[in-house]
């Protein structure tokens, strides 16, 4: 089939370092190409081609004229590709589909962020009964929506070839790891409290926030605590991530928001490293409490979990990813949705 995949333009496909959704787009495009499909991609500068057409589009600034122009420009770009397309898979903004929804080409809209009802209403209003499918990445992401029954849930996956299973981390000193944006929502301050309470060193990997509020949080709540058994090593690439996760005692995932799916959790499990996570949002769908990690309701619960990591068989973590969260499993489920529209 001829598949057009649309991604936001903020980061290239594949991403260089940070970029969860962009990594999923890359895995899907790569998997479709390997299975003999023609893959066209509309994405940001620096993106690679997957054999079909590569169409570069740019993110707008906040100024209204820029947003209006970029929207029109995107519609024109999509028009140049559509004659060679059997189905569209959109990973980006809902309004990318505005022109496409006026055609007879089937569209699949995959959501990465929390979903607002008005987005679904917008799509259904413009599609008017034509071929339109929705993909969510966790049950918790869609349960509050009208028409939630229209969603297919496809969990994110990881390429197991990029993550080495470590049966037992033996490189001293032992440490916990936090990997993600250094924001309050991600709970990096909680991770520090857990590590200090458990008496275990913490390695923090992630991007320094850019907006003023998150930068203030970093300067006041995180930076003063660095150096006391807590080391911030900055953003990491795939090789460094594999090493960092694989030799950690556990990944700390103390989120404070309804994150639809934290890809870093399955990256950690792929290495055999259990996850200590807040019991909220999608974490119960990913972590098997007591088997592949611990679901916790407080800092004290997380400290206790960090002291009981010896009860986790790391092989169970790897098996969980091989069974439910591999790239191949994910790609085959996307193909089930895409193949409905084969001629």
What are these regions (language model features)?
Residues 279-290, 294-295:
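Short acidic/histidine- and often glycine-rich active-site loop of Leloir-type glycosyltransferases
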Residues 206, 218-239:
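Nucleotide-activated donor-binding/catalytic signature segment of Leloir-type glycosyltransferases, i.e.
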